[in-house]
């Protein structure tokens, strides 16, 4: 190869034809000022349109370009690697598949002196660039031969058509570049490069050609650590994005659906990669995503509850509002941005459900007051299913995915604590209310009693709240409250009995005493209704408590009715004493006094509740007729003629009609009493024995408690002394009495003749013949004709004699 020497030229800047421009100095590291300007000014384009940089020089043709040792096989010197000119060091060093993973160690020095240091001087940069340009070969100084071939002024030939270059392979990113993508929230792209890096690290172990041995710290172990660190950084950004998208206003909320979509794409990519990794090496990023959602939900709920006023009830209301707010964000903005296969809405719903279950479980383990337990149970059983889960997509609730917030054992424990506290609190409160009300019973002032209202309010507070939680809890609470009510009513009965037995109370004015008694009676109906309602709601074993409550109230009502009736009839007794006398046949004064007194007391009795009032009026109606008939059957008046019997019967009918009008005005329901006096009047007036027998049969049928002694006394009053007729009439009563011996006796409120005692029945003697010498006037006297029936011999007398 000929060696071209530099021929001396007068002007070094003007090259001659056929000569190569050479430098005055052969030192390749010598800095030459203006070298870059000369290159820019001298390099042009060929007439055919191609760049003059492509011209062939002798050094390039002969392979004499400096630093040839740095060229990689298969690549032209100075050819760009990725569209950019390679530096001198780039041509010297053999490029690897990816930049060394040691670059990741520079992360700790990114914020060092270089990051914040002064910029280097322009001269140093120029010298470094001049040094790097040495590997590019000699610089052309004049036009090439092709420039002289094309005459001036002629058009250059058309360049050949460009052949499309094959697609260039994307160069893998370095660890620092992947980290930069993560920090810029380009999560899907960063995950793709991490997967590539992981695949490169796993390639030798999957049957690839074994590479050269690598030094410790620079081989596969370092790349594996890089992958692990990149995954940690990626997950930090992913879970931070989950928190920020739920946090409302902030950087995460402004990220939009794009960032959430990238998160979902990462999950899909990693799930596909887990299928390739196998079960042992799977990263399970989808499960960790669900855990991150649960952590974010827990943070959201814990931040909402503490600042809410109103105790536990206020905190639960704040939780409800936060749940509705966050689930609306998930349903409207976050869930649509995720891929459909991830089931994002269900994941978020389960995350919030689990976080809420933890919060409620921690609250249930604390010692809560009764009101907070009620609030917790009601929120768990009613508010959450109806107002939270009822407003979300029911597809997430299929097959019981969510499960209960609290375990059945925890719920049962809370209910047991509620029942125990209610039992203790209500019994103490009921006794306190009874003691306070009893203090006013003996006072002379007429104060309205609020005992029944206070008792109902104390118990209904619990019996109304418990069924709204659950039916079973309502039954248990009703049984508990009914037991407490039964104990209270037994104490109430005992104190009412002591009140009426107190001699000082009997010294009160009748009107005051009646008013106090009416107040006690009025406690019965609301308490009775409460007991019946609790028994209907409660379990079957509540029946004994209901019966005990009803028995105590019945006893109190009967006692108070008897007291009121006794007070009234003490005032009426003088008028009843005037009945069935000679003056009674001609003057209605006695009955007018009875009717007037009862009518005057009706205003006071109207203050009584309807149920006890009806029972009291019926009792007054019965007792009034008993007191009216009593003097008649005691023989106070005797009829010696048909005219007298007719007058007595007429008077009886008039009085019966007047009493019937009185008690109708008092709204008495004891209509069965209206016929007793008219029946007696018929027996008094009828003359023939069969008619009397029929009337006696009707009387015995309607009033089963009538006995032969009552019929015999009635026959004595009307003056029936015929023995045969008496026996025929009494036989009717005896037959009906014997036929009904096995039947049950009428109830106490239907008894009439049982309360009317009569003298011992009399019988007629058949006088012997020696009495025939007595005057007929003596034999006609009733005292001789009818004598008292001898007492039957006692069965105990023979034993006494022995």
UniProtKB/Swiss-Prot annotation:
InterPro entries: EXOC3/Sec6, EXOC3/Sec6_C. Transmembrane segments: none annotated. Keywords: Coiled coil. Residues 1-50, 142-168, 200-221 are annotated as: Disordered. One of its GO terms (cellular component) is exocyst. One of its GO terms (biological process) is exocytosis. It comes from the Eukaryota. Residues 647-673 form a coiled coil. Belongs to the SEC6 family. It is linked to Brain malformation renal syndrome: An autosomal recessive syndrome characterized by brain abnormalities, Dandy-Walker malformation, and renal dysplasia. Dandy-Walker malformation features agenesis/hypoplasia of the cerebellar vermis, cystic dilatation of the fourth ventricle and enlargement of posterior fossa. This is Exocyst complex component 3-like protein 2. It comes from Homo sapiens (Human).
